[in-house]
Amino acid sequence: MKLKELLSEDTDVVSGVIIYSKDKILLCLRTNDGDWSIPKGHVQVNETPVKGAVRELAEETKIYIPESELELVSFGMRTKSDGTPGLLYLYKHEAAGQYVPTLDHEHEAWGYFTVGNYPKPLDKILKGVIWWIFVLNIV
């Protein structure tokens, strides 16, 4: 086990927020893999998934949305980069207007995109979830 893993307060749970306004979704371009995705990241030890989503959103974009304004829309298994399983929680937030993020080092660009008209490459898990939520209205 690496020292970073021993000192880490992160869990195998990832949590994120889908911010949408009218028919557009906020996406950020990740610097590590070049995929477009929503602000999301690892939940820390002794942190609930929704608290992790709020924290990650604030850290990555400087946008603060209270827990009470987030709705859980997806929960499921994910495959981590090392091939082992983890959990993924996704929340959505309907904004009255479009927030302007201030990005951290994890992202290099951002934009609001119409559902179905995404930049490429789009995070593969996210594409399916957006389809369920906004096109099929399952959630």
Spans of features found by a protein language model:
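Conserved Nudix-box catalytic region and its N-terminal flanking loop in Nudix hydrolases
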Residues: 20-60
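Unchanged
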Residues: 43-69, 74-129
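Residues that recognize and position ribonucleotide moieties
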Residues: 11, 36, 111
